[in-house]
Amino acid sequence: MSCTIEKALADAKALVERLRDHDDAAESLIEQTTALSKRVEAMKQYQEEIQELNEVARHRPRSTLVMGIQQENRQIRELQQENKELRTSLEEHQSALELIMSKYREQMFRLLMASKKDDPGIIMKLKEQHSKIDMVHRNSCEGFFLDASRHILEAPQHGLERRHLEANQNELQAHVDQITEMAAVMRKAIEIDEQQGCKEQERIFQLEQENKGLREILQITRESFLNLRKDDASESTSLSALVTNSDLSLRKS
């Protein structure tokens, strides 16, 4: 009796597992059927749109079609020209950013050399600032220009690709705006660093002038002291001569 119950339970368990497998297979079939139905629906819609376009094209005269094609070709040429201008603008922005970064590195090096004997905290702060800005510049420039070069396409041959190119150009223009904004930030940072460098140079010049004045005062004091010593020596010599002369006169008398 117990064997039959265990066998029945095992059979029931096997049936449950088979039912689960069948359910999984049914769900996958349902998903595939849904995807196929969506694809068929999209193909039907595409076919209907093509038929509508063909009907419209049949009713339109050829001159209108030729004019439309010419206008589209003109727009394509304009988009090609815009692509060239955007590419040139990207190259100019890249060269400008490289120049800005080289000037910034040179200014930072000067500040580090000028502040080397003043405060080690300033040196660490300047190094951290330089590394952060350099990393931001490298990552942003590489990402922006790689995306820009990837999205510059050749001229399209029909309306859908032309809209795709316009979207790419909008994205490219956004990248150019971001690069321009970053260049403005870099210019502002360089101006601040130049102001700090001018302050440091003014301080160094002031200290040099003070040092020069102190050296002149010291030289004048030293010369005065030497002159006083010479005067004292001459006075002592004259006094000794007078004493000698008076002694001789007394002896003669």
Curated annotation (Swiss-Prot):
Bias (Polar residues) ranges: 235-253
GO terms (BP aspect): response to wounding; wound healing
Stretches for region Disordered: 231-253
Compartmental location: Cytoplasm
Residues with PTM Phosphoserine: S140
Gene Ontology CC annotations of this record: cytoplasm
Domain of life: Eukaryota
TM segment ranges: none
Gene Ontology MF terms: identical protein binding
Main location: cytoplasm
Induction remarks: By wound, in oral mucosa undergoing tooth extraction.
Coiled coil: 5-104, 160-223
Keywords: Coiled coil, Cytoplasm, Phosphoprotein
Pfam families recorded: SIKE
Function noted in UniProt: May be involved in wound healing pathway underlying the favorable early wound closure characteristics of oral mucosa. Accelerates the collagen gel contraction in vitro.
Family indicated by similarity: Belongs to the SIKE family.
Protein's name in the database: FGFR1 oncogene partner 2 homolog
Lineage of producing organism: Eukaryota, Metazoa, Chordata, Craniata, Vertebrata
